[in-house]
Each structure stands twice: as C-alpha cells, then as structure tokens.
C-alpha cells in the first residue's frame, strides 16, 4: 500500500471515529460491552481478594509514582494519574489470569482496555455511555 493510500485510509478511519456515536451501536454490541466490562471488574475484584501479595506490590509501585490526577486504582480511595491507574488496574485485573482471552491473537484485551478506558473516563469525568462509545 502506497503512502497516498495510507493517508486515505487514515482519513477514513479518523472521520469514522469522529462521527461515531453510541446510538450507532446495535443493542447486542452494547450489552456485550457491558458484560465485557463486568467480567474484567470481576477479575479485578478476584485479584484484590485472591492475589493479595501481587496486588500489594502493584499498589505499592503505583504509590511510588507520586502522580496526581482524578483516576483511581480499583479498591483504593486515593486519586492518581490516568496512566498510573490504567497500568495498576490492568495488572490487578490480570493477577488471577481469569480475564478474557482473544483466541486468534492469544491476548487478554479486557484487562488493558477496561483499565485504560476507566482511568481516562475518570480523568475526563465521563459516564458509562461515554466509556462504551
């Protein structure tokens, strides 16, 4: 693919993302997204209760970053930066290794995506609809 074709594709993708709305999603997609989020939050809760030592190391590392912001680490009261919260929450959600697996790529997308969207959502004062959108 040539440089000009890449620019066209990038332009199309950026226009699609800019014009995209929650209302464009079929209800099946929003319901699946909610289940995906709940599954990841359940894994994070499982990590907080079953992988106490690992979570302790994660939260200790996050606290050492001395970062400020409006985002929280799952199960903590203190606020931190979106980057620190995303990293810590993704690690916490993956501690018990029960998070979803995308089989073609053999990756655990939920722990990364949900952690990042929640951290950014808090930073931007977004609601659940905004996060799914």
What are these regions (language model features)?
Residues 2-133:
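N-terminal core-entry segment
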């Amino acid at each position: 693919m040539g440089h000009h074709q890449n620019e066209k594709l990038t332009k199309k993708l950026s226009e699609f993302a800019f014009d995209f709305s929650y209302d464009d999603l079929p209800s099946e997609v929003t319901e699946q997204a909610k289940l995906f989020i709940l599954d990841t939050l359940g894994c994070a809760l499982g990590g907080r209760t079953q992988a106490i030592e690992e979570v302790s190391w994660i939260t200790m590392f996050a606290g050492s970053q001395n970062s400020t912001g409006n985002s929280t680490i799952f199960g903590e009261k203190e606020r931190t930066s979106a980057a620190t919260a995303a990293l810590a929450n993704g690690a916490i959600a993956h501690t018990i290794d029960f998070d979803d697996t995308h089989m073609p790529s053999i990756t655990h997308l939920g722990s990364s995506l949900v952690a990042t969207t929640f951290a950014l959502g808090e930073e931007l004062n977004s609601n659940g609809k905004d996060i799914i959108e």
